[in-house]
Every structure is written in C-alpha cells, then in structure tokens.
From Swiss-Prot:
This is Small ribosomal subunit protein uS17. Part of the 30S ribosomal subunit. It comes from the Bacteria. It comes from Xanthobacter autotrophicus (strain ATCC BAA-1158 / Py2). PROSITE patterns: RIBOSOMAL_S17 (PS00056). Signal peptide: none annotated. One of the primary rRNA binding proteins, it binds specifically to the 5'-end of 16S ribosomal RNA. The lineage of its organism: Bacteria, Pseudomonadati, Pseudomonadota, Alphaproteobacteria, Hyphomicrobiales. InterPro entries: NA-bd_OB-fold, Ribosomal_uS17, Ribosomal_uS17_bact/chlr, Ribosomal_uS17_CS.
C-alpha cells in the first residue's frame, strides 16, 4: 500500500527536529453545495531543522517516531523573502 503524501505550510518550528504542518483540504458541503475549507495540523520529523515558518512542504507517512510524530518531511519550497 502506498504511503500518503500531503502538502501543507509550516506553522511552527520551535521544537528540535520537528515542524508542525497545517494541511488544508477543500470539499463541497453536501447540503449547502458550498466549498468549505478545513485544516488539520500534523507534527512531522525534520532531521536537519531546515524548514522555517511559512515554508511549503510535502510530508509522507512514516513509522511512529514519537508520541505525536508519524510523518516526515520529504521535500519543500522556501518562502519567498520580501
């Protein structure tokens, strides 16, 4: 079975070797027929502490690393500096 891969934005990088990634999904409400946005936060392993707040990253399912971490960062894009 293939591992799930999700795209999200880093919202916290305060802990060592860990980033918190907010993944947003969109769906059509069954009754209102309106597009609804929902988000969920995932704790992901970042071995090199390379990703900072605002970066877009892709995370992949992994074996449990700790109580909260079941995902690892596989790639990403740095946020454009303004």
């Amino acid at each position: 079975m293939p591992k799930r891969v999700l795209q999200g934005v880093v919202v916290s990088d305060k802990t060592d070797k860990t980033v918190v990634v907010r993944v947003e999904r969109r769906f059509t409400h069954p009754l209102l027929k309106k597009t609804v946005r929902r988000s969920k936060k995932y704790h992901a392993h970042d071995e090199a502490n390379a990703w900072k707040v605002g970066d877009t990253v892709w995370i992949e399912e992994h074996r449990p690393i700790s109580k909260l971490k079941n995902w690892i960062v596989i790639q990403g894009e740095k946020r454009a500096e303004v």
